């Protein structure tokens, strides 16, 4: 009896990560994710802080508080995505339980970087950007 209970608990523990994973993204989800990111980058190019901030997740909005504070951070620390010369979408992978869009970017200085955009789905089904991480192309690929 104890062996059966132990076997059941082991099977449950092994199945837990699979059950906790999100359902695969649909083609429309992938398109929506890319659209949100594209629209934010276009807002950066126009210096439209309110529009750019609107594509950030509620957590990111709480963290920065205002569109102005958010834009100041982007201008100072995220120059490649603020003023990209090239902005090419790569694949979407799962990182830390979130769909994460990889983008190959050439910044205004000609330097290549990979931008990783973790995404979050809101209760209404829409997608928002939950952060952005820049890495050099030489760094470990996701």
How should each PLM-predicted stretch be described?
Residues 7-15:
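Bacterial N-terminal signal peptides
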